[in-house]
Amino acid sequence: MFEINTSAVGDSLGLTALVAILPLIAFFIMLLGVKARAHTSGAVALAVSLIIAIVGFSMPVDMALSSAVRGGLFGLLPIVWVIITAIWFYEITVASGRFEDLRKTFDLLGDGDIRIQAILIAFCFGGLLEALAGFGAPVAITATMIMALGVKPLRAATVVLIANTAPVAFGAVGIPVTTAGEVAGRSADQTHDIAALISLQVLLIAAIVPFLIAFILDGFRGVKETAPAAAVIGISFALAQWLAATFFAYQLTNVIACIVSLGCAFAFLRVWKPKGVKELRERLELPAAESTTDLNGRRIWMALLPYAVVTVVFAVATAAPAIFGFLKLHFAWPLLDDAIVDADGNLMDTSFSFNVFGNPGTLLLLSGIIVAVVYHFFNENGRYNLSFGQPVSAFGDVVSRMKFSALTIILVLALAYTMNYSGQTIAIGEFVSSAGGIFALFAPVLGWIGTAVTGSDTSANALFGNLQVAAAERISVNPDLMLAANTAGGVVGKMISPQSLAIAATAVNMEGKESVILKNVVGYSVAFLAFVCVIVFLMTNVLGFLVP
C-alpha cells in the first residue's frame, strides 16, 4: 500500500511542492529554452517525474512505472485513436474532391464580401475542423482558404488564430474535456458538467469573435457594415455551443454549433446583404470574386454530407448506447488496484476502461466508412472519383504523420498520471490553494500557460487537471468549475502557442516571422484571458447559481 504524503520532502508542504513542480519546469525548459521537440521534452519530464516519485515521494519503483504505463495507455486509447480517425475523416473529403465544393459554398454564402466569407471559413468551418481534427488542422486549412480570397498573409494568419478560440475546448470530438475528466477521476456526469461550465465561460468570447474578424480585415467600418451578420453568426454559435454542451453530447458541441451558425447565416443572408462590398474589394485591391454558378443544391448537399453523417452517428450512439456499447474493456490496473491512498485517506480509482465501439474514435471511423462508400458510388459520373483504396491509403498516411504527435501525447499523459498517482500534483495543489479563494481568479492562467507552451488544450488538462481539483477541494470550490477554468484558459492560450504560430506562418508563407504574428495576436489572448479569469471568479460567488 502506498500512501500519498504531501509533506514527503523535508516534512514541508512548500518544499515538497517545489520539488513536485520540477517535472513541469523541466518540460518547459526543454521545450522553450533548449528548443527540443515536444516528444523529447515529454520524455525528459517523465524521467524527472519518475525519479521524484521514487526518491522524493517514496513510491515503489514498480508502482511508479505502472503509473506511467497507465497514463500512456490512456494517451493511446482513446486520445491518439480519436485524433487519427478525426484527421482521416477530413482527408476523405479532400481526396473525394468535395472539399472544393465546400469552399465554393462559403463564397456563395458570403455574396462576395470577404469579411463575411472569412467569418464563415475561419470561425464556422474552422470550428468544424476543430471538432473533427484539431491539433493545428483548422489553422492550416482555413489560413490557405482565406489567403485564396485575396487577404494579405499577416491578416489571414491573425484572423484564423483568433477564430480558433471558442471551438478549442471541444476540439477533436471533445478530447480536452474528456481528458480533464479522466485525469481528475470525474464521472461521466461530472465530465458533462465540466463541458457545460466551459460553454458558459467562453460564451461571450464565441459571440464577439466574428466582430473581431471583421475588425481585423476592415477596421471599424468592417464591423459597422457586417454587424448584423456577425451578430447572427456569433450569437447563434455561442448559444448552440452552450445548448449542445449542456443538454446533448459535449463531443458534438462544435459540430452542432457550427452547423447551426452556418444555417442561421444562410437564412439571414438570403434576406440581408452586406453594404460596401464593391468599395471593399477596391479598397483592399482584391481580385474579382470566383464564380459559383456551377454549384447546385446536390453538390452543396454532398459537400456537407460528412458533417451530417457524423452528427447522426454520434446522436444514435448517445441516444442508444447499447448499440455501440456492447464491448467495453474494464479491468483493475496491475500493481495499482486498491494500492494507493490519497492525502485524505481514500483509495484512488486506478482502473482502466475503454468502450471499443462506442468511443468517439471508432464512431468517427464508422462515419468515415459511410461517407467513403457514399462518395464512391455517387461520384457525378466520375467527377468526384473516390476509390476504396484511397481512404485506406489516407489512413496510413495519417498514422505516419501523427507518429511524433502521438508519442508526445502518450508521454504527456504518462507524466500526468505519474504525478497524480505519486502525489506530486496533489502537493502542488495543496500549496497553491493556500492562497485561498483568490486562487479561483487565477485558475485559468494555468490552462493558458499549459496550452501556450504545449500547443494543446488536451495536454494542458493532462498536466494541470488534477492540480486544479486538488486546489479546489482545499478552498471548498466546485472542482468541476476549476477543471472548466483550466480548459477555458487553454482556449485563449492556443493562439499564442509556438505550434499554432508556426502552423499559421507556414500556411501563409511567413516562415520565420512567427514573432510578427505573435505581436498581432498576443493582446487579444491576454484580454480574453483576463475576461475568463473574472468570469470564473464570479462563478465562485455572485454567479454561483450557474454552477451545477
Please name every model-derived segment.
Residues 8-22, 75-79, 132-138, 192-207, ...:
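Structural signature of hydrophobic alpha-helical transmembrane segments
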Residues 19-29, 36-58, 80-86, 230, ...:
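Hydrophobic mid-bilayer segments of alpha-helices in multi-pass membrane transport proteins
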Residues 66-149, 157-158, 382-470:
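Membrane-embedded alpha-helical segments and adjacent helix-loop junctions characteristic
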Residues 114-127, 153-166, 190-210, 408-411, ...:
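Alpha-helical transmembrane segments of multi-pass membrane proteins
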Residues 293-450:
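Transmembrane helical segments that form the transport core of multi-pass membrane transport proteins
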